[in-house]
Amino acid sequence: MKAFIWTLSVLFFLLMGIGHGRGRQFKIKKITQRRYPRATDGKEDAKKCSYTFLVPEQKITGPICVNTKGQDAGTIKDMITRMDLENLKDVLSKQKREIDVLQLVVDVDGNIVNEVKLLRKESRNMNSRVTQLYMQLLHEIIRKRDNSLELSQLENKILNVTTEMLKMATRYRELEVKYASLTDLVNNQSVMITLLEEQCLRIFSRQDPHVSPPLVQVVPQHIPNSHQYTPGLLGGNEIQRDPGYPRDLMPPPDLVTSPTKSPLKIPPVTFINEGPYKDCQHAKDAGHSVSGIYMIKPENSNGPMQLWCENSLDPGGWTVIQKRTDGSVNFFRNWENYKKGFGNIDGEYWLGLENIYLLSNQDNYKLLIELEDWSDKKVYAEYSSFRLEPESEFYRLRLGTYQGNAGDSMMWHNGKQFTTLDRDKDMYAGNCAHFHKGGWWYNACAHSNLNGVWYRGGHYRSKYQDGIFWAEYRGGSYSLRAVQMLIKPID
């Protein structure tokens, strides 16, 4: 670029110099012609005088001496042209030096311009960066304000919750005091009830010396050493209890001394399989082979019911109508409770006399009773047929023949009506449900009491043999660990 500028400058000044030189030559020629006109004739020149003039010229360092003698116009013309060229060269050299200086100035100015442009660009970048930092700072300030607001809200919530907790703690302490007073009151009432019962028994014993129910033998004639029947998962869904619970500790007084006045409804649960089916065998035939809670609707019932179907026992299809595993449910209840059913389906429960009646009368059913003692030994009793008569007959029990290895302690109750504390239908002068603390098909009174009190540890001490016992297995003074009653259609 510099070479190009230099070339253009040289050409420009050359053209100006040439034009200036030609103009000066033209002026000199005219002056010469005017001052020294050509001789038209040599003779005329010889006759005339000759003069020499000193003519000052601009930019000529010395005077020009024009001598007409011995020189012609061409020589003078050449001399003037060389002097002009020398002057032109000097001018061009000066202009070249000036151009070089200007070029340096231009280069310096160009660098300054570039630096200015860079500085402007950096300034714009810095302005953009400052703007970004300002926006970030603004967002940070806003966020901190929001955080401080949220923190204050959380502090208010914590204060409110703390206040509520203090109120709840105060209420809890008040309830504890009330509970302690009610517990003392209940205990006192229980003691008074026991004293009144003993007084009544003493008074009644004077009138009838045989008031106490007959006790079954403490130890049966034979205890089976082994069993050929493989029981199912007794207590497979039982509620876990504290392993440190004393083995000989009896259930709370309210589980022993007072019946429940209102039926305990079975809570809603998540069904394992859809239904309804008429019984568990029907559900198994439909392809459901997993043990669990099913929706069952017997043929003559008004609505479905929930119950436990046990399919782990070969060949499966068993309907569980009663189950005891851990004493978590009170079985000392009134007639209405035993009619409708109570307990937890996946734990201890009684299906209900009406439900058992509807199930057992839609087909021919058999009964299986599984027993487990506190040494983890399991035995069973099976009856070839099972059904209940309607409520008008107080759900009278009908059983078939016995087979099994537990001993037959149920046949003594065959043909008997169901008895509860408020509905006495047994063959005894007193109320067997009162003495055995449960509802059952009592005779006078019991060789089996599977709805009695759940005692921990097996052998228990009680005046009236009110534990869960099977007289032909372990006797009446041994409370079994787990029992369950199951029915299914006869093959």
From Swiss-Prot:
Signal peptide: 1-23
Fibrinogen C-terminal domain mapped to chain residues: 271-491
List of glycosylated residues: 160, 188
GO biological process terms on file: blood coagulation; cell surface receptor protein tyrosine kinase signaling pathway
Top-level taxon in the UniProt lineage: Eukaryota
Keyword Secreted among record annotations: yes
Location, primary (coarse class): secreted
Keyword check for Disulfide bond: yes
InterPro entries for this protein: FIB_ANG-like, Fibrinogen-like_C, Fibrinogen_a/b/g_C_1, Fibrinogen_a/b/g_C_dom, Fibrinogen_CS
CDD domains per UniProt: FReD
Keywords of this entry: Coiled coil, Disulfide bond, Glycoprotein, Secreted, Signal
Record's GO cellular component terms: collagen-containing extracellular matrix; extracellular space
UniProt GO MF annotations: signaling receptor binding
Disulphide-bridged cysteine pairs: 280-309, 432-445
Localization in the cell: Secreted
Protein name: Angiopoietin-related protein 1
Organism name: Bos taurus (Bovine)
